[in-house]
Amino acid sequence: MSIKLRHYIHPDDYRRIDEFLIRHYQPGNADGNWIEPAWEYMHGHPYLDSTSLRKIGVWEENGEIVAVSHYESQLGEAFFEFHPAYRHLRDEMLDHAERHLAGVSKEGGRKYLHAFINDNDPGFLSLVKSRGYEEDPEGDRPMCRFDIPEPFPAITLPEGFRLTSLAEECDWAKVHHALWRGFDHGEDVPMDEAELESRRRMFDTPKARRDLKIAVAAPDGDFVAFCGTFYEPAGKFAYVEPVATVPAYRRMGLGKAAVLEGIRRCAELGASLAYVGNDLPIYQVIGFKRVYDSKCFVKYLT
């Protein structure tokens, strides 16, 4: 049978692509695809444009998914996932992304696409350059890994601070406050029911474990640092996302402690390494090393 392209159908394709990413994961993320927890986190994130999910492209052969072209949060970005034997679909997948995943600029109303291509895929890099894409280094996304040591290093906190998790202390108002302030959205934190529900959906994704969602509580009980951690049992790895510290509590080692505690708990479950899609100093200090960069290329289509 021939390879067929069709539109994404939610929620069935959420599950099937989830399984696709797990099945084709190679140790050390050598496959270059998104790791499964990133796909899960995408669907719980409050910034996701869920109204456009149907525009995601799914390629099948004999009823098996062999490739996916998708965005992460909003139209205007494209990521590409492959069965290892179907990388010859690159050109067709880029065609699909330009037709269906393009965004429209706020200034001038021009159609554009940011295509994210791993720097260890020379064939795809050559393709996007030949089709008029230009590098946009500010959009590059590093993938980094941390080989979990044995014994695990001691985790220290300033006096009066403590580590906890959403399994032990699930307070969505505290979580929302820590993330809102931690991501520098301002001092006035909206606390309506819709905001708190969006945080619950963000962290209560299908395979999420509340015991891996780690918070640092200040002496007054408020959450002042937070690390959402995922464990993927088939690949035996942890994924760190998101991490934030309230501005007044930065440079105290709190974010680092939350990250390490999440990884430590994943190690107890069987993880031998952890991934994060960032190369910020906090991760470098812990010992994360770059695996590859997902290079950002931009093209204006109109």
Each language-model region and where it sits:
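Hydrophobic beta-strand residues of extracellular immunoglobulin-like
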Residues: K55-G57, L212-A215, L260, F297
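Conserved hydrophobic beta-strand within the GNAT/NAT acetyltransferase core sheet
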Residues: L113-A115, V240, L273-N278
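Acyl-donor-binding surface of acyltransferase catalytic domains
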Residues: I65, E72-G160, A167, S294-L301
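Flexible, substrate/cofactor-facing loop regions flanked by secondary structure
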Residues: A38-W39, E150-A234, A238
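Conserved active-site tyrosine of GNAT-family acetyltransferases
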Residues: F124-V128, Y283-Q284, F288
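Conserved acetyl-CoA-binding loop-helix of GNAT-fold acetyltransferases
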Residues: R87-A102, T245-P247, R251-R264, E268, ...
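Conserved donor-binding loop and adjoining core beta-sheet/short helix segment
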Residues: R6-Y14, I22-E107, H114-D119, P219-A238, ...
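Conserved N-terminal entry element of GNAT/NAT acetyltransferase domains
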Residues: M1-Y14, D18-G28, E134, R145-E169
